[in-house]
Amino acid sequence: MLSKKQQRRLIRSAYGTSAQFIKAIKRMYRSADRQIKGEISAFLMSEVDWSSPAEKDDVEDAVAELKQFDSSVAPLVAFYTSSLLLGHPKQSDLVTARVAVPLIKVGQSLHEMMQRNGKKIPNDVSKISKEQAVQTPRLHQIPYNYNIELQQNSSQVIVQHKGISDNVNRNIHQAITRIREVCQRAAQDTDAKRDYAKDVDRILTGKDGSGGASAQAEMIMRTQTCHELNQATTADFKARGVSKYRFLSLEAVNSCEDCTNIDGNVYDIDDAQEGVNLPPMHPNCQCWIEEVEDTTDDYGNQ
């Protein structure tokens, strides 16, 4: 069983890294915001018609830019290149691809952050668990096949990782779609042309700079950190033969009622289910679980 000191160390490690990633996310969205407004401004100044045919060289350049990304954002790349390669691409398809590039770049960076989280947090949990076993070998036992058991239990969460990855790409796609609509209005309406920059800001960073697609990405990162921490902790418990865990609600003024209501409740590890009795219970959840010491003796007595 981890000491309170080791628990705090693990929490700081997981959410400290997450906080650094969130700062980076804010910077990336601000940068994308500037680039996208630059692309829209250039398009509007060119005074080309929204529905007119795109030049072949411009299309080839846009396709080349889109194809520089890795497989994590392949669905996004395929979607935006298809409109340039199939049929007769228009200026609208071209400008959409150009505003998509900065956001797909953000999406790729988000995937990289989550992959790092997905490796770092389980490694930290395993490392601290082994250190605790050295300090208190009777209370925190590590079996000889711990690493094998840990790997088997950890491999069961691959499908959940896919769902988180889909959320990132969906968030990026929705932002691009909304920006395309802003660009179309600006191209076809004089009043909208004056306001497009504010509209792009609202979509990407929110009205006051703390919302929009950036806030959605930050939420995904916090939720994924909580997911990784609790899945890694659960895998550690199963590998060490721990049978029960206690739900620990985030000790903060913004803790939700559902999490607060089950704070301290004890559950069987085999019954653990994310969103029911295992964090994350909801987006932005930062709750955790701790081991419940088995007080049963060799004869089954408490």
Describe each model-derived feature in a short phrase.
Residues 1-205, 296-302:
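N-terminal leader/targeting and assembly helices and adjacent pre-domain segments
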Residues 204-302:
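Acidic, glycine-rich two-metal-ion catalytic cores of nucleic acid-processing enzymes
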